[in-house]
């Protein structure tokens, strides 16, 4: 396929929760585009930079040049900022009477792109942000998506940047907890991220020596967890480490949510109380939370993010709009957004990682 002519200016934004590696994508996309002779604009906090002249006291749109993206590959967060509350097709606004309503500024967004002479958008985000990008593409905006989720649950890519960093953080935490759990003969319940899939829990639990790993794909029983703890007691192992994905659920039950927010969470606290009641063992919960998203990305995530950023610009060159870049067969390829968002990549319950964990004596609570 021959490159598409007429590209002079592109925009980049980041949406949804942050992930280690976002800045590496921005740097690679910017430098690759500049090599093509294009101008690059950064949109602050998703699409907010197009709707407001100033965002958080800064210009809503920033010109990205080589100096501005120098030395950011190793930095966590995103120099453009992000938001998880920027659904353009249902944006929350405060009405004149003080109540909250919804508006759809998507047509205004597209008009702003035209007015600014932006020829294409590179949208970096998770399933929510990429769904918005897909809908904007269907309305005529030329978009290329870059997948971003530490959960590693998008079916169209073998790996997402930020995942390995999250696993590294969780694994280190599990390792540190072994000594204190053993010293006090406690059960430690460590809640990690993973709303719909258990990739972080599984890989960190296996690497970090967890005794029980609970994931959304395998419903658990508190009684079976108690049996594993009792088995360790009989072997004079008077402590246990349990890692649980935030979206895990008991057999016949539902995931735990934080109040009425609709956000996953709380399973670590609830499970710790149940285990202590059933076993009589002192049980302490620990929620790792946003520490899994923060800090400098590990080298693998930096390199994958750089590859994604460069590939996104190449997709713009080739006119592969309405697509997302993803890792397939070890190479970065373009996948239609509709196809990319149609499948959640779940942990195969009979896969090699689960089989390995079981052979090492790890319980999945089933």
Model-derived features: positions:
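Short, acidic/small-residue loops that bind anionic groups at enzyme active sites
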Residues: 37, 43-44, 136-160, 215-221
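Short Gly/Thr/Asp-enriched flexible loops that form oxyanion-binding sites at enzyme active sites
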Residues: 24-29, 128-141, 201
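Short beta-strand elements at the ligand-binding edges of bilobed clamshell
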Residues: 156-167, 296-302
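Flexible loop/turn connectors
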Residues: 303-317, 321
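A cross-family phosphate/adenosyl-ligand binding-site feature
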Residues: 1-14, 23-117, 124, 128, ...
């Amino acid at each position: 396929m021959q490159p598409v002519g007429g590209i002079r200016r592109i925009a980049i934004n980041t949406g949804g929760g942050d992930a280690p590696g976002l800045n590496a994508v921005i740097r690679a996309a910017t430098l690759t585009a500049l090599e093509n002779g294009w101008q690059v604009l950064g949109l602050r906090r998703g699409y907010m930079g197009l709707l407001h002249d100033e965002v958080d006291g800064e210009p809503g749109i920033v010109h990205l040049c080589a100096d501005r993206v120098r030395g950011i590959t190793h930095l966590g967060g995103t120099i453009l900022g992000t938001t998880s509350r920027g659904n353009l097709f249902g944006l929350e606004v405060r009405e004149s009477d003080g109540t909250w309503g919804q508006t759809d500024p998507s047509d205004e967004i597209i008009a702003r792109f035209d007015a600014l002479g932006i020829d294409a958008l590179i949208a970096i985000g998770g399933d929510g942000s990429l769904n918005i990008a897909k809908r904007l593409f269907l309305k005529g905006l030329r978009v290329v998506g870059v997948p971003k989720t530490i959960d590693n649950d998008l079916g169209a890519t073998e790996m997402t940047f930020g995942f390995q960093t999250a696993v590294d953080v969780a694994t280190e935490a599990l390792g540190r907890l072994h000594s204190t759990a053993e010293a006090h003969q406690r059960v430690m319940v460590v809640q990690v991220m993973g709303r719909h899939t258990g990739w972080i829990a599984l890989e960190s639990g296996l690497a970090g020596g967890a005794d029980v790993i609970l994931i959304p794909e395998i419903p658990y029983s508190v009684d079976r967890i108690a049996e594993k703890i009792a088995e360790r007691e009989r072997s004079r192992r008077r402590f246990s480490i349990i890692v649980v994905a935030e979206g895990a659920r008991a057999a016949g039950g539902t995931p735990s949510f934080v109040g009425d927010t609709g956000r996953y969470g709380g399973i670590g606290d609830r499970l710790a109380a149940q285990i202590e009641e059933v076993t009589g063992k002192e049980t302490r919960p620990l929620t790792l939370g946003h520490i899994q998203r923060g800090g400098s990305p590990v080298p693998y995530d930096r390199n994958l993010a750089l590859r994604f950023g460069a590939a996104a610009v190449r997709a713009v060159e080739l006119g592969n709009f309405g697509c997302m870049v993803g890792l397939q067969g070890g190479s970065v390829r373009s996948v239609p957004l509709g196809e990319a968002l149609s499948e959640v990549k779940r942990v195969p319950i009979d896969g090699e990682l689960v089989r390995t964990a079981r052979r090492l004596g790890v319980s999945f609570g089933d």
